Structures are given as structure tokens and as C-alpha cells.
Amino acid sequence: MVSNNEEKVYDALWDNTTYKTITNYREGKYNEAAELAKLSIDIAKKIYGKDSTKVAISMNNLSLIYDVQGKFAEAESLSINALEIWENNLGPEDPEIATCLNNLAGIYVSRGKYKEAEPLYKRSLEIKEKAFGQNHLETATGYNNLADLYRLEKRFNEAESLYRKAIDIFEQNKNVKDPNIGSSLNNLAEIHKIKGQYDDALKLYKRAFEIWKIACGPDHPDIATAINNIAGIYYLEGNYEEAEKLYREVLKIDEKTYGVNHHYNAMTFNNIALVKEGLGQYDDAERYFKEAINICQNTLGENHPSFVTFLNNVAGLYRARERYEEAEFYFKKGLLVLEKVFGSNNPDVAMAMLNLAEMYESQGRTEDAKRFSESAKSIYKKALKNS
């Protein structure tokens, strides 16, 4: 037991430590934030007991930090524990439950577990709508998060509708410089990019960049995201030199923030590789693709969708250079991962089969090409029938 005076001291210490945790997290100082979050958990357990909501708050903070650091298993475990404590103390409909559900869903998204994430995002959104109403900023954030998931699942019309809802709410609340509206603008730009509407996408990306720069400062991870997305448009438009310049800015910010072996760096290496391929610098492209694959394998693991993307990209490079044996190895490895993660009847599996079929056709391996092409068509027919 602690005395009343000790309790007051610990109470102030927990408040201060939690504040510093959040401040460091927002500034992208994740190692410092993690140590402070661990300390706040210890303080909360000592003064309030292991089942206190303040323990849950501290656990939730640490889970968010671990998520951005790529420590997904630890993040998931902490988030589940925090959710259990909150539900036991506050009941299933409290707004704090919505926050924890949202964070756990975000961890599942980071791990590529999209099916597990959707019901959590939906439950979180329902709680927010009930607690705050449909035009509240918290509800807008809920729309944005669910839209992010739909975008990743290629459910673009549903995603666009939710992004526009979120932006409307932010603007109604005169919150046009809030980082969250930057997120919604950035993600709506992704939809325009996918549809080939590059001018519209670039305008939205630049708006997001300006908002984040004011709200977060020039070296914040969100700035790296904005620069990365602007670079992506330049790449798609064939402006490879400008794209490479911006991607290297992204790499500099992310290496400073996360270290050299973070999964965000894997994506940037992949993007630089694509630029190098566009410039005809094939040896450099191969080197950067391999770097992306190695980092992804060591951080996200081989069952993550990004890993398949990197495998397919290096396979495409080998196919273009008529190094068919190496291309086949990476295409097949990507196909096996997709079948394991999504099942054998997923459209992404069909696309991977078509990549192999196209390569076999160019080699004159007509029977192999026909076999994979027919399998892909069968999957697409089933998908259309079930949609």
C-alpha cells in the first residue's frame, strides 16, 4: 500500500510521464516514447492496480508505439489486454472502447489481417456515432480509418464515399489545419491515383503536405508520407529524376525516425528500384529490390501483402531482361504466399497466375501458359459470380 502523499506524487508522475510519452510519439521520437510508456505502465500498476483504466491507457500508448516500430506481436498483445481492462471497467459502449478497438484494428491492418480489422473498425465507428453524433470529429476519424481499410482491399467506391464524409465533417468543424484532414485528403488522393486521375491526386497530396508541414514540422513521419506520395505521381508521369530525389528525402526522414531496418524503408527502397528500372539502370534496380525484400522479410514476414509486391516487382525486372529462371522463381514464390494468405480463389492469386502465364507465353511454353491462364480465368469467374 502507498500513503496519500505517495499517491499524489505517483499520480503527478503518471500524468507527466504519459504527457511526455504522447509528445515524443507525436514528434516521431519512438524509442524515447516507448521507454516512457513502459515507465507509465509500471507507475499505474503500482498506484492504481493492474486492472485500472490508467494501466490500459499506458498499454494502449505503448501498443501504438510498437505498431509504428514494426513490433506487431507485442503491439497486438498490449492492445488486446488494454481492451479487456477497459471493457471490464467501463462497459462495451464507452468512447474509450472505440479508441482501443480502432487501435487494435490498425495493428491488424499493419499485419495484413484485413478481415480481422473490419469488424473492429465498424464497432468503433458505431460507438462513436452513438456517443458523439454523425458530424463529430471523432466520427470523421472513424470514417477515415474504415475507408483506409476499404482502399487496401480495393473497395474503392466505398472508400471514396467515406473519405468524402470525413473531409466534409472536418471542414464543417472549421478544422482545416488538423492533421487528420491531411490524412483524409492524402487517402482520397490515393483513390484518384488508382483511377489514373493524376492531376487531381497531386493537388490533394500537396494540400495534405502543407497541412502536415504546419501541424507536425518538416521532419515528422507524416511529412515523409506526403513527400513519398508526391514522388509516386512524378514516377507515374515519367518524371523519374524528380521522383528519385523525393524518395531519397523520404528515406532520410524514415531512417532518422525508425532506423535503417524498418519496413517503411523497404517500401522506399522498392520505390527507388522502380525509378531506377524506369531510367534503365537495371543493376541498381535489382539491388534496391533485393534490399526491399530482405528488410520486409525480416520485419513484416513472408505472409504480408507488401512482401508479395516486392517479389513481383523483382520478378518483372528479371522477365523484362529475359532472365526467365529467376523471374519464375520470384513469381512462383509470390503466388504461394498469396494462396496461403488469401486462399486459392482470390483475384490477386489470379493476377499472379496471369503474370506467370504471360512469361511462359513469351518463352514459347504454351502448355504452361494455357494452364495458368485457364486457372486465372476460373478464379475471376467465381469472384464475379460471388460479387
Model regions: which residues?
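Conserved alpha-helical positions within TPR/SEL1-like repeat arrays
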Residues: 15-26, 53-68, 79, 95-110, ...
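Amphipathic alpha-helical segments of tetratricopeptide repeats
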Residues: 41-46, 83-88, 125-130, 167-172, ...
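TPR/TPR-like (Sel1-like) alpha-helical repeat modules
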Residues: 332, 361-384
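Short coil/turn linkers that connect adjacent helices within long alpha-helical scaffolds
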Residues: 6-8, 46-50, 88-92, 130-134, ...
